[in-house]
Amino acid sequence: MGKKTKRTADSSSSEDEEEYVVEKVLDRRVVKGQVEYLLKWKGFSEEHNTWEPEKNLDCPELISEFMKKYKKMKEGENNKPREKSESNKRKSNFSNSADDIKSKKKREQSNDIARGFERGLEPEKIIGATDSCGDLMFLMKWKDTDEADLVLAKEANVKCPQIVIAFYEERLTWHAYPEDAENKEKETAKS
């Protein structure tokens, strides 16, 4: 189910903001360090799809659902052989409709968009963690920018282990049990 999000109305009063319902999150990109999502708006055709900054959105379930699919797609790309079969090549040469060309350009652009560590930014700290995508993911804050990306914990463990350790240390709690305190007092009294 879509959620409402603010989007400026195309009216003469630029201060008015209306709320529209997001039907689906279609893609993700980072522009100048800011995460944006390509949205399909409920009740509007695909030609009205827009890129919206993450901070303007109020649809965490749809974003989470998209990230699950995105992660699976990324893993699939890494496991796919690079060569295409001859039949696939022929098939793609015959599909030249405007829609096919548009969707091909969108796919090419989305594949070129760097995400997470691919952006080449230096990690500053981990803001939070989630397993909503099936694997443990960290919300990584980058140095010299206000932006953050979800990154695989496995990747963060290798690329910035000290930041991962600091994240866990900040959340580490010790539980003292009354019997432990009594035993320590007895040992101290004996010495």
Swiss-Prot record:
Gene Ontology annotations of biological process type: DNA damage response; heterochromatin formation; negative regulation of DNA-templated transcription; negative regulation of transcription by RNA polymerase II
Gene of this entry: CBX5
Region span, Disordered: 70-117
Name of the protein this chain belongs to: Chromobox protein homolog 5
Any matching Pfam family: Chromo_shadow
Residues bearing PTM N6-acetyllysine: 40
Gene Ontology MF terms in the entry: chromatin binding; DNA-binding transcription factor binding; histone deacetylase binding; histone H3K9me2/3 reader activity; identical protein binding; methylated histone binding; protein-containing complex binding; protein-macromolecule adaptor activity
Compositionally biased residues, Basic and acidic residues: 73-89
